[in-house]
Curated annotation (Swiss-Prot):
Gene3D superfamilies: P-loop containing nucleotide triphosphate hydrolases (3.40.50.300). Its EC number is 3.6.4.13. One of its GO terms (cellular component) is virion component. Keywords: ATP-binding, DNA-binding, Helicase, Hydrolase, Late protein, Nucleotide-binding, Transcription, Transcription regulation, Virion. The keyword Nucleus does not apply. Coiled coil: none annotated. It comes from African swine fever virus (strain Badajoz 1971 Vero-adapted) (Ba71V). This is Early transcription factor large subunit homolog. It catalyses: ATP + H2O = ADP + phosphate + H(+).
Length: 1133
């Protein structure tokens, strides 16, 4: 076998030397050094100083990222590693992706699956299937259908999917015609994944569905109450120990049960899995001790039932592979390690790894060493804390102690129980044991109808989930009114809940409010209002439960304190999303009243409704939370859901264990989850609320116990990750204990990897992939800089991290592959790949030149001919709309970067006493086209001077101007008005003539029909023009086109850059001024003023040239205005 076997003594060393893995070691690069590299190659496209750093090839944004990037999905190094490791060419049968939440496990699994699918497509018959099993299978399908780069849908189909999604959302109903069209389209795409006749290779199952379909209980089995779990059980559930023979004989027991007619194994599924691929997401769910199920049994069976060479390959995924108990490591390793590779060829049993006495468990001596050995080559570990992509996690509160021991890792918001809560807690005795139906006492207690007044001595509340609904439902109306309690009418999805003023921070004086019943929820409400007053930011509130003190009561608490749900109308007590003031008292003049709103997600809400609420919460339009400020979620949000730009997370109850708490943190701390926010706001503050008593309290005791158990799990995690296959590439080094890991160092470091091995890289097609990667890098570089020499381009391509998202070691690129990439992009004129650069269709051309060949990004004209255009990349081409835009309506639809009304008012102010000609160079094309149409259609008053300027420069035309052209005059002769009435204007390509002001219809004619020559000869000194830079217009100059000779291609690089006049050297500025005849003492004039003189001189000369006889046909060109087309030089070699 070309790849090393797992039992090789130097397995990781051999693996690390292979180029397909070694190249994924991301080289360390200093940020300042990287910026220097960007500027050295003239490819800085954003950030401070980008115009200078990029030499102004294209307009740049000083607030944007400085790095060129590759459009679309790019697999990161960890994803590439596991794709290369677990594929049909390697011998490795099972792999666990132990990656933190939000790092792209699903994409990695899909990338692996794609490799197997490509392999299976070569089978003539009986091709295996790829099974995706897990609670989050729908999310994996969604990723497959929204990422054309993965190869399952086209870009056109993704665009259509987005269009249908938008239309369906606008309909506001899940049953509308638009929604049905969307569902039909999605179903068609999904069938492509699963229908073999359409090229599908996938089967998608939930864990429960998979287990049920694999093991069919017969009628005889039902009569005997047969349970598959009975064949695979723990002999002593209380002690969590296993019978010696339970696991080892499980497959045999299934066969016996099948022979006895109690069960039927689905042979169709088994045959589909033979030699196939099994992907199991959130694998910790299948063997969790606290939630008994047969999910893990089904997976274990399909992995053990086949001979080793026929068993399906497997990819397991989890950020927290062991959750409920450290002894789950036995179940995990039995799934992860093939049976024949376990000690003695038998499944592991718990007594092999653990000593247990009562409820106390500890690792046996040498048990962790066994975990290390068994997991070598079977685990990928990723803990990514790169603050460039992840928001900072901030814990509010402080560390607490329980029984004189400080609880590790976590900070808490300490919430002392109210006196009423403490009195209620006393009812459970001095050392209370909180049963599962009494968990509400951790959060709050409810008013008790046993007492007419809850404030009377010895009164206590309700908290038991069995007793509370009955007691409150039977309470009298008078008692309910007296205590501010309102029973919410039960429904199928919400059998019982209450509301009322007892949940308010400010109840009527005769009613005890929220502070009386819950110290925790009172603190939560105070914190919410404080956050709103501080400024913007979305809030996620988590509670593990739905009923009693869970998310349903949280919903009522918010509503009782002035926070609305998604649909309710504001009332006088509704709070403002900006200042938290109630509407009746809202006196702020600096902002309008916007109601605070929340939404809720839990398992009893229809999935379609949940998806719509989540989409609205995550929408870019809701970045500040002014549409939906708060989302309340139950345990349904713990896995699979992603939340964008959440600034505050409030955790109101501990999930089942600490690993699941980490999952909850991971819902809001995700890669790129905060990229739309300003850098200063890319953080999440976590509020972990805990109810306490003077001696600590039962909830704090629960946290203490779970953290103690978690330390044992962390010891196992460290052993599991010790020899991770990608430790040397991910370079995860942890120096001190942290929530996600104990101290850890990779067993191999980049420094001791060794010499590069190429045999598998060349044999298995990785060279072809390198060519594709280099091609994408080349394209990105041309999008930043349009002209390169061969050596410059190769140096840039081989510079690490120059392209955003490409973090592989470019220094390992082969120059032969670089040459192949160039050939693939520009081998000949007919074979050149078409690219979109700066919204223009281009191709990369090879141009022979001396001393070194050039590669140029040439724009394609309408005939798809390459054009080497001097100004293509810096000219702001904005054609006018093909319909009239009235000024009043333009404000609603303008696509300019500054509203027309703002520019219009500025124009009226600035040009009262200034030369009107200056308007042509102070405003963008979009302003002028809108103004011209307004002058023609709306007949704006008081604009005579502006009209005269437009006419002087032959931009606007009156009836009188058209009369010399009889055939054209017929088009506008019927338009009302005298000879001086404006009827048309010139654009880059045509003259637009009004045919009906009422209908706003236009007729277009070529420019030459009015004797306008777009290719007038340029003067021999200098050419001026204005370039749009954000909201500003910059005056630029360049040499005349005739200076550029077709055989002097190297000059194109200089001309393509353009030149802001002020950046030119003083000597050059003075020379130009002298040639233009500007006679002043130039030595005492600043560069800015000198450039203004040059600009105005060129504009004056342009006007004079146009007004000479036949000036628009033969006049000399001095200045290109907003509606002038820049010249091109077509390269014909």
């Amino acid at each position: 076998m070309a790849y090393p076997e797992l039992d090789a003594a130097d397995f990781l060393q051999q693996l690390a030397r292979r180029k397909e893995f070694k190249s994924l070691i991301s080289p360390p690069v200093d940020q300042k050094e990287l910026i220097r590299d960007l500027r050295a190659h003239f490819v800085q496209i954003g950030g401070p100083g980008c115009e200078k750093g990029g030499r102004a090839f294209f307009p740049c944004d000083p607030y944007a990222s400085p790095f060129p990037s590759i459009k679309g999905l790019q697999l990161h190094n960890a994803q590439l590693f596991v794709q290369n490791f677990q594929n049909p060419n390697t011998p490795y049968s099972r792999l666990l992706l132990n990656w933190q939440t939000g790092t792209g496990k699903s994409i990695a699994a899909i990338a692996i699956a794609r490799q197997f699918m490509n392999h299976y497509m070569n089978f003539i018959e009986n091709a295996p299937w790829i099974f995706v099993v897990g609670f989050t299978r729908a999310i994996i399908q969604t990723e497959m259908l929204r990422r054309p780069e993965l190869g399952f849908v086209s870009y056109k189909e993704v665009a259509e999917l987005h269009r249908l999604l938008h239309i369906a959302k606008q309909s506001g109903s899940t049953t509308s015609v638009e929604s049905r069209h969307l569902n039909g389209f999605v179903s068609t795409l999904k069938r492509r994944l699963t229908d073999r006749n359409r090229g599908g290779f996938f089967q998608f199952y939930g864990y429960k569905e998979f287990a049920s379909k694999l093991f069919n209980i017969t009628s005889k089995g039902e009569e005997k109450n047969f349970d598959v779990l009975s064949l695979f059980h723990r002999s002593d559930e209380a002690e969590d120990t296993l019978n010696e023979n339970d696991i080892s004989q499980f497959v045999q027991k299934i066969s016996e049960a099948e022979t006895n007619g109690l069960i039927r194994v689905n042979q169709k599924i088994m045959e589909q899995l033979r030699g196939g691929l099994l992907i199991a997401d959130e694998i910790h769910n299948v063997y969790n001790i606290q939630e008994r199920n047969n999910y893990g049994i089904a997976l274990q069976y399909v992995l053990d039932a086949f001979p080793p060479h026929q068993a399906p390959r497997a990819v397991f995924m989890s950020a927290t592979p062991v959750t409920g108990s450290v002894m789950e490591y036995v179940d995990l390793l039995n799934l992860l390690v093939p049976r024949h590779e376990l000690p003695n060829g038998q499944p592991l049993q718990r007594q092999q790894l653990f000593d247990s006495s009562g409820h106390s468990v500890k690792w046996k001596k040498d048990a962790l060493a066994l975990v290390e050995r068994l997991s070598t080559g079977r685990v990928s570990f990723l803990l990514d804390t790169n603050t460039n992509f992840y928001p900072e996690r901030i814990f509010a509160g402080k560390m607490l102690s329980y029984k004189d021991e400080t609880l590790p890792y976590l900070h808490f918001i300490e919430c002392p129980m109210s006196e009423y809560q403490l009195e209620t807690l006393k009812q459970l005795g001095p050392d209370p044991k909180i049963s599962s139906n009494a968990y509400s006492i951790y959060d709050m207690v409810f008013p008790n109808p046993k007492f007419s007044k809850q404030t009377e001595p010895k009164a206590y509340g309700l908290f038991n989930s069995t007793e509370t609904p009955t007691a409150l439902s039977m309470a009298s109306t008078d008692w309910l009114l007296e205590n501010g309690v309102q029973i919410i009418e039960p429904s199928r999805r919400a059998p019982f809940n209450v509301s009322g003023s007892f949940l308010s921070l400010q109840p009527p004086t005769h009613i005890s409010g929220l502070a009386f019943y819950s110290g925790k929820y009172t603190q939560m409400m105070k914190d919410i209002l404080s956050i709103i007053r501080q400024g913007r930011g979305k809030i996620l509130i988590y509670h593990n439960r739905v009923r009693m003190s869970g998310v349903l009561i949280l919903q009522e608490i918010l509503q009782s304190n002035g926070i609305l749900n998604e649909v309710s109308s504001p009332v006088g007590t509704t709070r403002c999303s900006i200042c938290a003031a109630i509407r009746d008292e809202h006196t702020h003049s600096d902002h309008q009243f916007i109601p605070v709103r929340f939404t809720i997600l839990h398992s009893e809400i229809e999935p379609a409704v949940r998806e719509r609420s989540l989409a609205l919460f995550n929408a870019s339009s809701n970045l500040e939370g002014h549409q939906l400020r708060i989302l309340i979620g139950s345990k349904v949000i713990v896995e699979g859901l992603n939340f964008q730009a959440v600034r505050y997370e409030m955790i109101m109850s501990l999930p089942l264990d600490i690993p699941r708490l980490i999952q909850v943190f991971g819902r809001v701390v995700r890669k790129n989850s905060h990229m739309e926010l300003p850098p200063s706001e890319r953080n999440v503050t976590i509020y972990l609320y805990v109810s306490t008593t003077p001696d600590g309290g039962p909830e704090l005791a629960k946290y203490a116990q779970k953290l103690k158990e978690y330390i044992l799990i962390q010891e196992g995690d460290k052993a599991l990750r010790k020899h991770a296959i990608d430790g040397f590439t991910n370079q995860i080094k942890i120096d001190k204990p942290m929530l996600e890991s104990l101290p850890l160092s990779p067993s191999i470091t980049p420094a001791n990897v060794g010499a590069t091995v190429l045999n598998t890289f060349e044999a298995y097609g990785y060279g072809e992939q390198e060519v594709k990667t280099i091609s994408n890098i080349i394209i990105s570089l041309f999008m930043a800089r349009p002209v390169w020499t061969y050596s410059e381009l190769w140096k840039a391509v081989s510079t690490p991290k120059l392209i955003q998202g490409i973090t592989i070691d470019n220094k390992l690129f082969s120059e032969d592959n670089f040459a192949l990439a160039l050939i693939s992009l520009c081998y000949s004129k007919n074979q050149c790949k078409e690219l979109w650069i700066q919204n223009r269709l281009c191709t990369i051309m090879h141009v022979p030149a001396k001393p070194e060949h050039l590669y140029v990004a040439a724009v394609l004209n309408h005939k798809k001919e390459p054009v080497l255009d001097i100004e293509t990349y810096i000219r702001d081409f904005q054609l006018p709309a093909m319909h009239s835009i009235r000024i009043t309506k333009y404000l609603e639809h303008s696509q300019t970067k500054e509203p027309f009304q703002v520019l219009y008012e500025k124009f009226q102010k600035d040009f009262q006493d200034e030369p009107m000609e200056q308007v042509l160079i102070h405003y963008p094309a979009s302003f002028h086209y809108t103004m011209l149409e307004a002058l023609i259609i709306d007949n704006l008053a008081g604009m005579g001077a502006l009209v005269e300027v437009y006419k002087k420069f032959f931009i606007a035309f009156s009836k009188k101007d058209i009369q010399p052209f009889p055939d054209i005059f017929k088009i506008i002769s019927h338009v009302p008005g005298d000879d001086n009435t404006l009827v048309g204007y010139a654009t880059e390509d045509s003259v637009r003539l009004i045919t009906s002001r009422e209908d706003k219809t236009w007729h277009e004619i070529p420019l030459y029909m009015l004797n306008i020559n777009v290719k007038r000869k340029e003067n021999d000194i200098v050419i001026g023009y204005m370039e749009s830079k954000g909201k500003a217009l910059k005056f630029k100059i360049r040499p005349p086109i005739q200076v550029l000779k077709k055989n002097e291609i190297t000059d194109i690089r200089m001309l393509n850059r353009g030149a802001v006049c002020e950046t030119r050297g003083r000597e050059e500025q003075q020379k130009i001024a002298d040639q233009l005849g500007i006679s002043l003492n130039l030595t005492k004039i600043s560069a800015i003023k000198l450039c203004l003189l040059i600009r105005n001189n060129l504009l004056q000369k342009e006007m004079e040239a146009r007004n000479q006889p036949n000036g628009m046909q033969d006049g000399i060109r001095w200045f290109y205005l907003f509606n002038d087309k820049m010249p091109s030089l077509v390269h014909t070699s």
